[in-house]
Every structure is written in C-alpha cells, then in structure tokens.
Amino acid sequence: MKQKVLIAALFLVAYLGFLLVKLPATLVVRHLPLPPNLVQLEGVSGTLWSGQVARLQYASESLTQLRWELNGWSLLRFAPEVSLRFGDRSGLNGQGVVGWNGAAFGRDITLNVPAPWVLDRVPMRLPFPLTVAGQLQLKVDQFAQGNPWCDNLYGNLHWYGADADTPAGKLPLGDPELKLTCIDSRLVAELKQGSEAVQVLGKLELQPNRQYLFQGTLKPGPELPDQMKQGLPFLGQPDGQGRFPLRYQGRI
C-alpha cells in the first residue's frame, strides 16, 4: 500500500512539474514583482520551459532577442539551470548556461561587445578624451560564486583589433588578453598585451576585502607616440630589458 502511495505521489509531483514548466511565459511575467519604472519586457512568447523576450529594458540599458531553455533534469537535482542566448551581431550579444545551487554558477558563457560600448559605460570620468576601437569577447568555461567574488573561475577576456586614440596620439594595442582565475577566493587576472607600440605584462588580484593590487611591466616599442615616450620616466627606472615597472593598488 505504501509503495502505491509513493508511486502515486511521484506521478503527481511529475505532473505538477509538467504543468508548471508549460505555463505561458506571458502569464508568468504578468505576476513577476518587477519595478515598472526600472524593468520593462516587450514581445514575451513561449513557455516557462522555452521562450523568448523580444526586448528587455533595464533602466537605460536593453537586451534584444533574449531566449531561454530550462533544463528539466536540473530541477530534479534542486539546482535549476537555464540556457540563455541574446543580442545580435551588431551590438551586445552572448550565450551560456547559468543556474543556482545555493549560489550562482555558470558555464560555457560567451559575451561579445564593441569596445566603444564598454567605454561609454565606464563609471568614472576620464582625465582626457579617449576613443577606442575593437571587439571584446569574454569566454567563461566555469564559474561559481563565492564570498564575495568566486569559488571557481576559468575564463579569458580578449580585445580583438584593439586601438586607442588619445590627445598624445594613436596607440595600436594588438590583441590584449586577460586570463581569469579564482585562487583562494581571490579574483586573479593575468594580462598579456603586445604590439609595435607597447608591450604590457602583469597580474591583477582582487582580494575578498575589496583591496586590489596590479603589478607588471611596460616596454615601449618603436611605434609608441613621442609624447607618450616623454612620460615614461615617471614610471621609474627601466630594467636591463627596457621594461618599466607598473604597480597600482587601492580599494574598490
């Protein structure tokens, strides 16, 4: 008798789960407690299991063609995860898998964005006019949220076709790369950049207490603008290979 009750209960739970994921996305969105002046959704279609939003507006930012696919098996593991895809090739776009198992996690994440789009959203005022060119691509193989930054992280940030135009001249940067890892809850980014104008190598560490430290070197190249070369002595004395020391620390 107990076995029959257990089987019936399992079937009931499975049926209720089926009904839940088949809920129309428009019905779910209608009952979400979204702040009306901050978040707006347009063109919602599909179901809770699989659907899309033509446009998601958050404050002054927006995402287009947001699509999702809920992993049903992940619900049985009590670690729901969803595959996301959004944007178009002309602007911000990306895809990946994100979820929650007591903390946020993600894998196979790719994010593409034009470099000028990022510069326009830098929160601090720059001391001089600056324009940039190129395309940024973030790839995250694995990520697990920690306290406060991360427990696990393997990824890379590339800046393809990187160029910067400053009052001191145009600065070709090649294709800079950041290798992203997490070590003992510290967010670590290793920078490797090289061009005919300048070569920069270094490591940035962000501590759990929000302290950061960047240490590296800068080696000028033949195409470095003369006005920029004049400022190199302020960095200190170069080593035997012509590399100037870089060190910045502070708190965010």
Swiss-Prot record:
The keyword Nucleotidyltransferase does not apply. It comes from the Bacteria. The keyword Chaperone does not apply. PROSITE patterns: T2SP_N (PS01142). Keywords: Cell inner membrane, Cell membrane, Membrane, Protein transport, Transmembrane, Transmembrane helix, Transport. Residues 26-252 are periplasmic. Its main location: membrane. The chain crosses the membrane at residues 5-25. One of its GO terms (cellular component) is type II protein secretion system complex. Pfam families: T2SSN. It is found in: Cell inner membrane. One of its GO terms (biological process) is protein secretion by the type II secretion system. Coiled coil: none annotated. Residues 1-4 are cytoplasmic. Belongs to the GSP N family. Involved in a type II secretion system (T2SS, formerly general secretion pathway, GSP) for the export of proteins. This is Type II secretion system protein N. The gene is exeN.
